[in-house]
Amino acid sequence: GGFGGLKLANKLKKSGFQVVLVDKNNYHQFPPLIYQVASAGLEPSSISFPFRKIFQKRKDFYFRMAEVRAIFPEKNMIQTSIGKAEYDYLVLAAGTTSNFFGNEHIEEEAMPMKTVSEAMGLRNALLANFERSITCSTERERQELLNVVVVGGGATGVEIAGVLSEMKKFVLPNDYPDMPSSLMHIYLIEAGDRLLAGMSEDSSRHAEQFLREMGVNILLNKRVTDYKD
C-alpha cells in the first residue's frame, strides 16, 4: 500500500486484471510528510488516505486489511492473517523499515520514523518531556529531558532535525515561556562525511548551513554504536 503498490494498482486500471491489495493498514501513508506529524505541524489525517476511498470507483479493485504470513509459490497462494488467497501474479511492494544495522539494543530503545504511528509516538514523547521539564527542580534534570539526538543525515533525519529546531526557536518561547529554550539541544549524527549523501553536494552544503544556523549540532563521520539511558 505504499507508493509502489498504489502506482501499480493505478496502472492496471482497465487492464482486465482483478487487483487485490493487501495491507496491514486500511490507509496509505505519505512518508515525505511524516516528520510534520512528529513535530505537530500536521495531523495524521492530513497524510493518511483510505484505500477504499482512493479506489472507490474501481470495480476491478478489492482491498483486504491483513498481514501476509507465508507465500506458497508452487500453489500460487499466500497465507494471511485472515486466511488464504490465490493469485495469478504476485507483486511484493512492502516498502522499507528502519535499518538498525543489527544493534538490537538501539532497536529496542530508539524511536524510528517510518509510519504515522511512530511519528505520533515521537510527538507525544516530545510534548510529555516539555511538560515534565517545567516541573524539574534543577537545570540538569531539564536538559536531560530536552536533549534530542537524531541518527542519520538522510532526508528524514535532516527534516526532523529541522522541524525540531523550529520548535525550539518558535514554539517553546510561546507555549512554554517559563522554560528557557536554550536548554534544548538537538544533535544530528551522520556516519558519512556529509548530509543528504544521495543528493548533490550543493544541497548537502545548504542543508548543513541552514541547520547549523538554526542551532543544530551536526556530527559528521561519527557512527552510533550503542545507546545507554
Predicted regions and their residues:
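Short secondary-structure capping/turn micro-motifs that flank functional sites
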Residues: 28, 227-228
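Predominantly flavin-linked oxidoreductase catalytic cores and closely associated redox partners
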Residues: 112-113, 117-210, 214, 218-220
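A conserved beta-strand/loop element that lines the FAD pocket in flavoprotein oxidoreductases
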Residues: 57-72, 212-227
